[in-house]
């Protein structure tokens, strides 16, 4: 069985030219699959039937693997079995038609107004702090995705009209407003940006002058959140979710929020209506004389 796995790794590395990260992920998943098969005396790939594939998923779930990781394991196994079909080792792919457990929709966590004020209450004039605050203010002000913030250039912002041009999913461009505080923070950052010796027109650059990567932006946000005493873990998703939730609470205009967020389908935006209803239900329970629950 290991012989075919080695052939597969060579195929991925040399013909498909997958990244080392992808290759390592596939190897990790297939190592776990091999362990399950060996523990159950399956010594040949021809013994792997649809029921065996389901058994692998069941055992993986039993060991505590989450839904997203289960989907990744099934994908890795399915692609390897497809390779065995190409090699003539199998006639059909036994993983075809088998689905991983569906991932449940989780309500996104958001940051309340008090926490946001605490987060952004920083008047440091250090260049890195000016940059980081500008990123936070802009992301929260316009509800940007991480990739949208990372891709901004100097020409993306119009300070006179306070509009920002972003490239969203599917290379769809949209124009968004940004607020007074974000405008001020970005302009303060631009005053010191040249100190970083920028190598191109990226709006946010690292200390080496390169466009900041998604990971470096995430890391800076984590550091900022800890430093500002935020109790919960800070990440770009939370700022975007906070923007969406508070916009919906203030306007109740689902279509407008959909446009601002750049969602193709209204159903994606509707998750925030559940958040909004949850908030309203809590207020109702606390305020309505006939709704208060006995303790």
Swiss-Prot record:
Quaternary assembly: Forms a cyclic heterotetrameric complex composed of two molecules of XerC and two molecules of XerD.
Residues of the Tyr recombinase domain: 106-285
Family named by the database record: Belongs to the 'phage' integrase family. XerC subfamily.
HAMAP family reported in the protein's UniProt record: Recomb_XerC_XerD
Protein's recorded name: Tyrosine recombinase XerC
Job description of the protein: Site-specific tyrosine recombinase, which acts by catalyzing the cutting and rejoining of the recombining DNA molecules. The XerC-XerD complex is essential to convert dimers of the bacterial chromosome into monomers to permit their segregation at cell division. It also contributes to the segregational stability of plasmids.
UniProt keyword terms in alphabetical order: Cell cycle, Cell division, Chromosome partition, Cytoplasm, DNA integration, DNA recombination, DNA-binding
CDD domains recorded: INT_XerDC_C
Location in the cell: Cytoplasm
Gene3D superfamilies documented for this protein: 1.10.150.130, Intergrase catalytic core
Predominant location category: cytoplasm
Record InterPro entries: CB (IPR044068), DNA_brk_join_enz (IPR011010), Integrase-like_cat_sf (IPR013762), Integrase_catalytic (IPR002104), Integrase_recombinase_N (IPR010998), Integrase_SAM-like_N (IPR004107), Recomb_XerC (IPR011931), Tyrosine_recombinase_XerC/XerD (IPR023009)
Database matches in SUPFAM superfamilies: DNA breaking-rejoining enzymes, lambda integrase-like, N-terminal domain
Record GO biological process: cell division; chromosome segregation; DNA transposition
A GO CC annotation given for this chain: cytoplasm
Origin species: Mannheimia succiniciproducens (strain KCTC 0769BP / MBEL55E)
Core-binding (CB) domain sequence ranges: 1-85
MF annotations from Gene Ontology: DNA binding; tyrosine-based site-specific recombinase activity
Residues of the active site: 145, 169, 237, 240, 263, 272 (o-(3'-phospho-dna)-tyrosine intermediate)
PANTHER family: PHAGE INTEGRASE-RELATED, TYROSINE RECOMBINASE XERC
């Amino acid at each position: 069985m290991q012989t075919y796995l080695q052939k597969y790794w060579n195929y991925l590395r040399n013909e498909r030219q997958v990244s080392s990260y992808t290759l390592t992920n596939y190897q990790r998943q297939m190592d776990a699959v091999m362990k399950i098969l060996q523990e159950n005396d399956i010594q040949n790939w021809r013994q792997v039937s649809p029921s065996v594939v389901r058994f692998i998923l069941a055992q993986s779930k039993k060991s505590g693997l989450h839904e997203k990781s289960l989907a990744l394991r099934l994908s890795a196994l399915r692609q390897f079995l497809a390779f065995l079909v190409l090699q003539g080792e199998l006639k059909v792919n036994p993983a075809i038609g088998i689905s991983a457990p569906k991932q449940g929709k989780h309500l996104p966590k958001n940051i309340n107004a008090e926490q946001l004020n605490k987060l952004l209450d920083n008047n440091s004039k250090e260049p890195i702090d000016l940059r980081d605050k500008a990123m936070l203010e802009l992301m929260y002000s316009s509800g940007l995705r991480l990739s949208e913030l990372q891709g901004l250039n100097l020409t993306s912002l119009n300070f006179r009209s306070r509009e920002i041009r972003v490239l969203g999913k599917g290379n769809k461009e949209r124009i968004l407003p940004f607020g007074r505080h974000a405008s001020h923070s970005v302009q303060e950052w631009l005053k010191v940006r040249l100190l970083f010796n920028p190598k191109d027109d990226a709006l946010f650059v690292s200390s080496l002058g390169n466009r900041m990567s998604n990971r470096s932006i995430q890391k800076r946000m984590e550091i900022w959140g800890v430093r500002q005493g935020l109790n919960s873990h800070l990440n770009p998703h939370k700022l975007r979710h906070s923007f969406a939730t508070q916009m919906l609470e203030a306007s109740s205009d689902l279509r407008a929020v959909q446009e601002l967020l750049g969602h193709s389908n209204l159903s994606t935006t509707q998750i925030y209506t559940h958040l909004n209803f949850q908030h309203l239900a809590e207020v109702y329970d606390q305020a309505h004389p006939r709704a208060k629950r006995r303790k």
